[in-house]
Each structure stands twice: as structure tokens, then as C-alpha cells.
Design a protein with these regions (language model features):
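Extracellular glycan-recognition surfaces and repeat-rich motifs
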Residues: 1-22
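Short tryptophan-centered beta-strand motifs in secreted/extracellular beta-sheet-rich domains
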Residues: 168-176, 181-183
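Structural motif
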Residues: 17, 52, 180-182
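Secretory/extracellular carbohydrate-interaction modules
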Residues: 19-145
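Short, aromatic/His-centered strand-loop micro-motif at the edge of beta-sheets
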Residues: 112-126, 146-171
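Ligand-recognition surfaces built from glycine- and aromatic
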Residues: 50-52, 62-64, 118, 198-245
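Short strand-turn-strand beta-turns centered on an Asx-Gly dipeptide
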Residues: 184-189
Length: 245
């Protein structure tokens, strides 16, 4: 795994795993600590086409500013550009399957009927190209709401809010295959969806905590940036096991 941290963030190896932390700070700088297995690779060579991921995890608070989580994605926005030595990647439509926490400033959904904040089990499945991308791009300068509605027809997504005390240790398991995505908490199936990223588009594992927010609301409002951390925050994990199927 690649181990990375921005300024005012840290990664610490523990007896059974890792502790990823970000320091107390204002909303002027990005703070991120992460583990991944893809950031040195071009997107077409990301390592996984189906996987089972197991770990135990807890965080400092159930209401942290920013985002944190663990799972797989295609790094659609080239976010690893924030770290030196990472390859350039053009933006892409999202493909992801993950346990994802988003503070209230975030809204990462392209439909109006799925939860997009709090602690979620979430999946996105997108094509490489779709004819509706052309009118979506043309509509963006004039109507962000129309663009969002068109993207909602292109990007398949599914999510479920999870009722879990994330400040306590829990076991999490994610199963991704071409036909389904399944999310387990303490060996109990918490969510299952037929919306699953195509195996033809490989994904990479990411485990992270940061102070970032991004939103594309149902009203068409776009927002992104970084948030203040009134207190230090950390994500601790142990017993990480990744099995490619």
C-alpha cells in the first residue's frame, strides 16, 4: 500500500494496522491522510476488477468535517495530483464502491432519491462515454440543474445510510463483483445492490480521512473546498485484508 499524508496530516503504523490523522486547523489548507494501491499507476492499470475487502475501523467522532472512508474507486477527479510523483489523469465519470462518510457540506449524488450525507454504503457505475455527455456539457454554462439531471441518467448509483456508532470498533466487509456490491457490518449484511462498477474498468483501494467537501445539489448548486477542523481527527484501522477474486 502507498502511504501518503499532506502537511498537517499523519499516518502511523500500529500493532495491527494504521492510524490516519489530520490536525486541528482552519479552512485555508487541505489536510489528507490516506492509504492506497493505485496512485502510482495510470487508471487503466488500477489493480482490481473484483474484490473482497475486510477491516476493522473506528473514528474520533460521528460528525467530523470533511470525508473519510474505505473502499474502491477510479480516482475520477485525479485527486492524487496533490501528491508529488503521481501520474497525470484526466477527469472521468465516477466508478466506486465504498463505505463513505460525508459531512453536511457534501452532496455526492446525481439523483434526488438517494442519501448523500452521513455514513453510507455507496456505489457508482459509469460508462467511459455516453451520448448524453454532449448535451450535458453544452448545458452546463446555462443550467447546472439540467446538467445534473442528464448526469443522473448516465451515472447509475445506489446508496444506503448506515446506523453504526462509528466511534466504536466495528468489522466491515465489502464484496464487489460484476453483478453486485455487498456491504457487511459485524458479519451482518447491511446493504446489497445490483449497481456495481463494471469489471472491465479496474478500481483501486483507498482508505482516507480529509477535510474536503464537494457538492452538486439537486438545485444545481456546485461547491467544493476545505473545512475547518476544530479538533484533531483520526481514522484507525486494523486487520486489513484484501482478496482479489
Amino acid at each position: 500500500m502507498n502511504v501518503k499524508a499532506t502537511q498537517n496530516a499523519s499516518t502511523e503504523k500500529t500493532e495491527k494496522g494504521w492510524r490516519l490523522g489530520i490536525q486541528k486547523g482552519d479552512s485555508l489548507s487541505y489536510r489528507d491522510a490516506q492509504l492506497d494501491d493505485y496512485s502510482l499507476l495510470p487508471r487503466r492499470k488500477f489493480p482490481h476488477r473484483s474484490i473482497t475487502l475486510n477491516l476493522r475501523a473506528k473514528v474520533t467522532s460521528s460528525s467530523l468535517p470533511g470525508t473519510w472512508g474505505f473502499g474502491l474507486w477510479n480516482d475520477p477527479f485525479g485527486l492524487s495530483l496533490g501528491f508529488g510523483g503521481s501520474p497525470f489523469r484526466l477527469p472521468a465519470l465516477p466508478n466506486a464502491v465504498w463505505f463513505f462518510y460525508a459531512s453536511p457540506q457534501n452532496y455526492l449524488s446525481f439523483t434526488g432519491d438517494k442519501p448523500a450525507q452521513g455514513f453510507l454504503a455507496q456505489t457508482f457505475r459509469s460508462p467511459i462515454f455516453h451520448p448524453l455527455l454532449i448535451p450535458a456539457g453544452l448545458a452546463l454554462p446555462f443550467s447546472r440543474k439540467a446538467t445534473r439531471n442528464l448526469l443522473g441518467k448516465i451515472i447509475a448509483e445506489d446508496s444506503s445510510a448506515l446506523s453504526v456508532d462509528v466511534t466504536q470498533w466495528h468489522g466491515y466487509r465489502l464484496e464487489w463483483s460484476a453483478k453486485r456490491s455487498a456491504f457487511w457490518v459485524d458479519d451482518v449484511l447491511a446493504f446489497e445492490s445490483p449497481v456495481s462498477p463494471h469489471a472491465s474498468r479496474p478500481l483501486g483501494v483507498i482508505i482516507w480521512i480529509d477535510n474536503q467537501f464537494a457538492a452538486f445539489t439537486p438545485e444545481g448548486k456546485i461547491g467544493f473546498g476545505v473545512l475547518e477542523n476544530p479538533e484533531p481527527a483520526w481514522l484507525e484501522l486494523e486487520d486489513l485484508k484484501i482478496v482479489s477474486v
